[in-house]
From Swiss-Prot:
Source organism of this protein record: Penicillium expansum
Superkingdom field: Eukaryota
Domain remark in the UniProt entry: The LysM (lysin motif) domains are small globular domains involved in binding chitin in eukaryotes. LysM1 contains one LysM domain.
Signal keyword on record: no
UniProt protein name: Non-secreted LysM effector LysM16
Matches recorded under Gene3D superfamilies: LysM domain (3.10.350.10)
GO MF term set: chitin binding
Function: Non-secreted LysM effector that might be involved in manipulation of host defenses for successful infection.
Lineage: Eukaryota, Fungi, Dikarya, Ascomycota, Pezizomycotina
Keyword terms of this UniProt record: Chitin-binding, Virulence
InterPro entries: LysM1-like, LysM_dom, LysM_dom_sf
Gene (UniProt): LysM16
Deletion consequences: Leads to enhanced fungal virulence, with faster decaying on infected fruits.
Amino acid sequence: MTFTEYMGFFQDKYELICMADEERDNFCLDVESSWNITNMVLLDEATWPTYTNKCYYDVSGITEQVWINMRLNINIIPANNYTASENINITIASPGPITTICPQAITISQNTTLTCQQMAIAYEIPTAGIRNLKIISIAIGVAAVNGTNPTTSNTTATFVSAPTTTVTGTTSECCEWHTVFSGDTCQLIEAEYGITLEKFIALNTYVNSTCGNIWPDYAYCVSGIATANSSTSTTAITATSTSPPIPVTTSGTLTTATTSGTITTPAPAQTGMVSGCTTFYEAISGDGLLRDRHIVRHHA
């Protein structure tokens, strides 16, 4: 027996692939030792898990009692008995309606993590069927199925535009955005979208390691691809700055000196403005700055 066959046999014995005694919740080995399978088959009382479809199944290594029960419940092609036990010559009743079209691919919804047993119930397929699926399609940013290493489908991600202003260092290949509100923290964002801090920073590289520089009214990517378009810093403010970042997109206007020297500070302006400024920026709604106040961009 190969290792693969042995593991299949082990799962046959201990997982939810055989038949269940609903009153005692017994499976497989308990079934073989405590049930009189022969009489159950004759009385048409043999069972199959109620939440799974009766799909094709590899019966190699299963004992004769389980094989008889499976022959009653499913139409196995080719109908060969691979067990070493002696055949029991009994008349088996014709099986009832059988699901012959079994799923070849399933899609796990976004931000979902499932065990194999949970998936068997959710998608109505035996756990053995999950191992034989051709494709398990997982959306970008979704955790893999526990205990498996599925093959993801080659789907094309749909990127969406940011709903509001972003900062330098935010990926352009984003599938979902979060606009920060006053009081938001990275912990709240992580919990809402099922994203780790490391992934969040990879998508929004302006954010520092303590996540202490996210700003209200700015959009941050929470599901997407960290690409070369993401930058580790901005040209004006470093990633460790505690001041609001310079936005990537805005409709605000710049006031720039046309000759060397300074220009008159436009009004209104916030207090504490430095002298010797050559360029001013007029803040607009959504910038995360004081509305209708000019700020310094460059100074001598």
